[in-house]
Amino acid sequence: MKRTFQPSVLKRKRSHGFRARMATKNGRNTINARRAKGRKRLSK
């Protein structure tokens, strides 16, 4: 059976990357929430 996690940097960046987050209002909310919490890494 194939494992479910087949890593790809490109797919990761496109769905969870900083620019992907900034592209939508909800994504910007996510970034701002992580900034407010003091996260070292805002996105993948």
From Swiss-Prot:
The UniProt transmembrane annotation reads none
Region Disordered, annotated ranges: 1-44
Instruction: Look up keyword Ribonucleoprotein and say if it applies.
Output: yes
The UniProt keyword set, sorted, is: Ribonucleoprotein, Ribosomal protein
Q: List cellular component terms (GO).
A: ribonucleoprotein complex; ribosome
Biased composition, class Basic residues, residue ranges:
10-19, 34-44
The terms under GO molecular function for this entry are: structural constituent of ribosome
Top-level taxonomic group: Bacteria
**Biological process GO terms, please?**
translation
One Pfam family from the record: Ribosomal_L34
User: InterPro entries of this UniProt entry?
Assistant: Ribosomal_bL34, Ribosomal_bL34_CS
What family does the Swiss-Prot or TrEMBL record give for this protein?
Belongs to the bacterial ribosomal protein bL34 family.
| NCBIfam families, alphabetized | rpmH_bact (TIGR01030)
Name of the protein: Large ribosomal subunit protein bL34
Q: What is the lineage of its organism?
A: Bacteria, Pseudomonadati, Pseudomonadota, Gammaproteobacteria, Vibrionales
